[in-house]
Amino acid sequence: FILPYSVDMLMTAILAVFFQALSTSKYMGWGLMVVYLVASITLVSLGFEHPLYNFGDVGFVMVSDLNGADVGGEKSWWLRLYWGGICAILSVIAYLLWRRGVAVSLRAQLARVPARLVGAPALIALIGLGVSTTTGGWMFYQMNVVNEYVISDEQEEQLADYEKQFLQYENVKQPSTTHVQLDVDLYPHAGRALFKGSYTLINDTGAPVEELHVLFQDGYSDLTELDIPGGTLTLDEQEDYGYQIYALEPAMAPGETLEMRFAAERIHNGFSTRGEDTRLVKNGTFLNNA
């Protein structure tokens, strides 16, 4: 705990010093820091949630006795490196703008910056720029290209659309599961798990079942194979909503059983902004068939 929190507090302290360097008085510097604290909370609630533009955001880290800081720990240190580069630049700017002797206006201080930006300050600023640009670009690729960046409002909108589209099927009678067979290959250090299995279903509704509704909503796993004897895919919203409908030909008679086979995979790709997978970890993996 000590090292990561010390780094986080140091970055906040550097930002506070930077605000003081921009201000004509210490009270104005305090005021700017208060504005930053309020804005950081307000902007997140307005949808500005990306850790690459929320100062000092290092993501979520779950610490446990079994798994240490494996969940989110690597991403948090990459983000600290990114923000560390930016803090190096802020430190140089604060040093160059710091008032020495007779007080002068901020405009006059800014005018002197190019002449002062030589030697060690220039080198530190250049290194900070290189570190923040390189790590920031790589993290953006991991979070926005390899993974999908979705803000909370979009997730809520997607949930509302799901309810509007599929609420009509709420009371559709479906067969019950009587037996589950599941084979799992775990590769915890690679962040990967492969699943193969089957569900034995029985039509206990008292009436023929003409359609089978399949719901697979796991943001960390992909359904790679689904075999339903006599089933024809008539609705496929798997990518957006995890919902599929299969027409059964012939219809499933009362008391009849059916074996549905499937395969799926769970893979950790890059870094995600939507939260960490706390189920598949290096030590202490916990999975269920829900």
Model-assigned labels for residue ranges:
Residues L3-A290:
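Acidic/His-enriched low-complexity segments
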